[in-house]
Amino acid sequence: WQDGFGVMFAELHGDNSGLPAQRRTLERLRELDVRVVIPGHGAPFADYAAAVARALARLAAFEASPERMAKSAMKALFTFTLLEKRRMARAGIGDYFGQVAIFRDVSRNFFQREPAAVAAQVIDELLKAGVLAEQDGDIVARGN
């Protein structure tokens, strides 16, 4: 978690307890005297105070804009989807967002838009960021 934290599923499902719990956790972590962090994912790191500060800044941005949190979650979840599936036809991703509850519900509840429109925006932003690539009409995770 050197550069942030994971998806806040509670908020995505309409339970507003996740962000306050994350804040309490980060504030408690900030009080600890830590020399090295050995995370469950990623390399060990020593700049603990900076990592907690980054996580708190990200949390503040999400508290100020639940839509930003939801968009970040959609990007992360779709990236993980592609890591599992390897590739998806771009033409079918809008339908996929409409069929998968988390994508469908977040599209409608946070953005008041149809899932296909949100899918198009998520794909475009991830392509622009270099996280995804387009190959022969398919969307793939970079490096796959």
Feature-to-residue mapping (PLM):
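C-terminal regulatory/interaction regions
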Residues: R68-N144
